[in-house]
Amino acid sequence: MPSKLLKDGRAYALQAREKINGAWVPSSYVNHPALVADAFHPDNPIYQNTIFTRDVSKMPLHPNSAGMAAWMHKNSPDPWGTAWVKGQKGGGWGAKTALNSSAFGTQPIAAYVVDSTHPATEYAWMECKTDGMSTVGWDATPTPQGPKGIVAVQKIISGLIPLPTGALPAQNGDRGMSLYDIGSGIWREYFDVHGPLPDRKGPNGEPVYTAGVGGFSVNDPGRDISRTNPAAQTQSGQSAVACMHNSLGFIHPDEVRAGKINHALAFTFGAVAATSADYDAQGRVIRLHGTPSWPAAASDAKAPPSEAPNSPTHGQWGRVRKDVDPMHNPLTGLPYNPLTRMLIVAAQKYGIVGTDTNAFVHAFNTHSGVPEMLATGKTTDPWAVNGEIAKILNPAEPHKAFDISDFPWHLTEWGIRDWGRPLVDFYPRRAALNSNVDPYISPEYR
């Protein structure tokens, strides 16, 4: 059952019970009761009041906004890939815009929302190697277990975590997984997740998972984290390069059922330009550097730095022009495809933001169908080709329902870099452990 926030700040999930032989006992038909199945429903979502719901109608535009729109349209599929640094031809192919889901394509980060205050919460055992791009300035005081800051992080990203039995990370690509606990307020992110491992059990028989990288933020319990984390940033680590809880910008089956998306759309760049590069003595590229825009904290831009003046960057907000009519595509004279129409409406009000790179084609992402399958007991992914969501979007031709290749990148507008960044920002760009990076102080404030 959904959680409710009590006045003292604690979040509880309701536990269903049934009367058997005169006694009230936990219901036998409740699947994974601590799983908050309606967390992304547009009527009471966990992204409420965060940066993903800010109005973009008055967003100040970048001086080269038009050039960026043209660049985004031109450079998907990605014409460079990663081979250009070796002087080789590479890049992507196919449609200009793709949709990724748990049923097809490169699977996006799988997000699970739980309420660990529920008495029947299920747990898993996580072994995570590192928090990756650490917050600058972790306490390096030596302890028998290692540097004090790293030891503290491990207590959050490793060990027992509240995760429903049967949970799966993305099954290909980055194998990402998010775990948002609205009972404690701890939101975790993981990259390169494997599990549940068939040949291992945790200390108390729990399923075991491993992750190459993890991250987290500590927030107010409940569905509204905007007081403590309005920008939806991780405090350390990540599941994707932006170091954000970017699955808040994914498309959920409940949103298609409701016919509305009430948040900005987090997409994956096909191509995004690096801002600079390091070269060896022979002039060969040995390292690329990307500069993100707030609220992103890092970038893995892969396209040539010469493209940077026209390329948006990770974390930079964009929007679809308000004069775009979802029922009229000027390139075809026909209405945009059904799902594209939903994306256009959301992007006109809340915007779009690139939070990762695939060096292939621009792609929007859906929430994994696995959490819903666990909550309902259904065995078919709602995103299945010709499945439930496909038939809602396009009853006559459900096999075409997920075609968003007509998304109008050429009709987008791009905001200034760091739009909305606090005048004093104690959340610096990510860097190596103990790097000397000072908090950001706006010139307006100095």
Give the location of each predicted region.
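Extracellular recognition modules
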Residues: 13-17
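Detector for glycine-centered tight turns/loop "hinges" at secondary-structure junctions
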Residues: 9, 22, 184-185
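Residue-level signal for short segments within beta-strands and strand-turn junctions
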Residues: 18-20, 191
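Short, surface-exposed polybasic-aromatic patches that bind anionic ligands, especially phosphate groups
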Residues: 35-446
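Short, isolated positions in well-ordered beta-strands
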Residues: 12, 25-27, 208
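Extracellular fibronectin type III
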Residues: 21-34
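Surface-exposed, short loops/turns at beta-strand junctions within beta-sandwich domains
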Residues: 2-11
